[in-house]
């Protein structure tokens, strides 16, 4: 018998990508979907593969929610906080799959990334776990690209610098980034290509605009286009941002590490739209050759591609422009550092909305249906 599965937040950015992937993989043929809304209950629901799925249900109606076998939420932490615990309190024993961060570190929650921790997921289902949550986007993308080194237990510690896309903050942030880009172009467009105007004068006009009150920065609070923001999320007591804290904490939970792998670094927002990039310095436990490392990385999963450490390959295949909209999680710039043969550099790229958010949720369903 097909399971009844509720989808909440399916029209948002992550939810839309999730539904798109589910259609692409013919997932909707394998269960009965019920679509919910937090703001437009009783509105017309979607038609998928020629089948109309009825009006939207109220996402806050516990009586409807509690009748379902599985709930998938891409609605965010506020919704999870309002609904999840109430559902559990009234005895709902179904599976909760969530993209939000609020439940990740709870003891009764499993962080899901099946190419990395499928055994943990299966064991948790057998043990009665009911809550499965996607990981932080940078963590999931790092583990996809560097998974072979983790699975072979070759890593002693990692330092990382992230280059995170606007999509990690949400849809309105992507829109604001594009508005900033458009505003800068409008300011400069009348002068570009005109030899009578020096590029320094044009740059000054754009710079003055970006520092003015006219510049669109309601969400970011500061310019991102033509700039960057070296801080993401709240401040922790030790001086880390919460985004930086998540990397070590979530990685070791996903890996079920007996001894924590030490990971730290700086998380930076840049003007990419939906692809996160990361630069790593990795201390290996032993000296192994670059060809061996490349083979270990390639063997881990079918989405990881090793990009040769050459300028043309790197510029054409190891960028957000090359990776956006794909499930590829390439890794490149692999070389030993001058400080020692156990020290490895690496650079990775991955789509924040796919492996960084929606794809682990979609694949989790395979374990449950």
From Swiss-Prot:
Residue sites binding NADP(+) per the record: 11-14, 38-39, 75, 167-168, 195, 352
Annotated residues for binding of phosphate: 104, 246
Reaction equation(s) it catalyzes: L-aspartate 4-semialdehyde + phosphate + NADP(+) = 4-phospho-L-aspartate + NADPH + H(+)
Active site: 137, 276
Pathway entry: Amino-acid biosynthesis; L-lysine biosynthesis via DAP pathway; (S)-tetrahydrodipicolinate from L-aspartate: step 2/4; Amino-acid biosynthesis; L-methionine biosynthesis via de novo pathway; L-homoserine from L-aspartate: step 2/3; Amino-acid biosynthesis; L-threonine biosynthesis; L-threonine from L-aspartate: step 2/5
Record-linked Gene3D superfamilies: Dihydrodipicolinate Reductase, domain 2 (3.30.360.10), NAD(P)-binding Rossmann-like Domain (3.40.50.720)
Protein keywords: Amino-acid biosynthesis, Diaminopimelate biosynthesis, Lysine biosynthesis, Methionine biosynthesis, NADP, Oxidoreductase, Threonine biosynthesis
Presence of the UniProt keyword NAD in the record: no
Binding site for substrate: 164, 243, 269
Pfam families: Semialdhyde_dh, Semialdhyde_dhC
Annotated EC: 1.2.1.11
Top EC class, one word: oxidoreductase
One MF annotation (Gene Ontology) recorded for this entry: NADP binding
Gene Ontology process terms (BP): 'de novo' L-methionine biosynthetic process; diaminopimelate biosynthetic process; isoleucine biosynthetic process; lysine biosynthetic process via diaminopimelate; threonine biosynthetic process
Keyword hit for Oxidoreductase: yes
Family per similarity comment: Belongs to the aspartate-semialdehyde dehydrogenase family.
HAMAP family referenced in this protein's UniProt entry, alphabetically: ASADH
Subunit architecture: Homodimer.
Role according to the record: Catalyzes the NADPH-dependent formation of L-aspartate-semialdehyde (L-ASA) by the reductive dephosphorylation of L-aspartyl-4-phosphate.
Name used for this protein in its record: Aspartate-semialdehyde dehydrogenase
Gene: asd
């Amino acid at each position: 018998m097909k399971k009844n599965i509720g989808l909440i937040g399916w029209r948002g950015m992550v939810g839309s990508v999730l539904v798109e992937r589910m259609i692409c993989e013919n997932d909707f043929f394998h269960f009965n979907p019920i679509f919910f809304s937090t703001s437009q209950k009783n509105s017309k629901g979607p038609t998928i593969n020629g089948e109309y799925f009825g009006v939207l249900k109220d996402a806050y109606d516990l009586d409807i929610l509690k009748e379902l076998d599985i709930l998938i939420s891409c609605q965010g932490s506020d919704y999870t906080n309002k609904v999840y615990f109430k559902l559990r309190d009234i005895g709902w024993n179904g599976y909760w799959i969530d993209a939000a961060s609020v439940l990740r570190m709870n003891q009764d929650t499993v962080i899901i990334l099946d190419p990395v921790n499928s055994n943990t997921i299966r064991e948790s289902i057998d043990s009665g776990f009911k809550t499965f949550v996607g990981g932080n986007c940078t963590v999931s993308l790092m583990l996809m690209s560097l998974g072979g080194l983790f699975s072979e237990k070759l890593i002693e510690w990692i330092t990382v610098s992230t280059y995170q896309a606007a999509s990690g903050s949400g849809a309105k942030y992507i829109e604001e980034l594009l508005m900033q880009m458009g505003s800068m172009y409008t300011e400069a467009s009348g002068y570009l290509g005109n030899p009578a105007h020096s590029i320094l004068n044009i740059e000054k006009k754009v710079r003055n605009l970006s520092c003015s009150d006219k510049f669109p920065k309601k969400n970011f609070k500061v310019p991102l286009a033509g700039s960057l923001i070296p801080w993401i999320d709240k401040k922790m007591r030790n001086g880390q941002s919460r985004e930086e804290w998540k990397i070590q904490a979530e990685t070791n939970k996903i890996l079920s590490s007996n001894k924590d792998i030490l990971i730290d670094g700086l998380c930076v927002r840049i003007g990419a739209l939906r692809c996160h990039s990361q630069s790593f310095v990795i201390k290996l436990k032993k000296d192994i050759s670059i060809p061996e490392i490349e083979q270990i990385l390639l063997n881990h999963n079918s989405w990881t591609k090793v990009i040769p450490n050459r300028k043309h390959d790197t510029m054409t295949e190891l960028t957000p422009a090359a990776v956006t909209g794909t499930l590829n999680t390439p890794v490149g710039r692999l070389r030993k550092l001058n400080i020692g043969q156990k020290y490895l550099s690496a650079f990775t790229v991955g789509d924040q909305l796919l492996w960084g958010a929606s794809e682990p949720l979609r694949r989790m369903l395979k374990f449950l249906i």
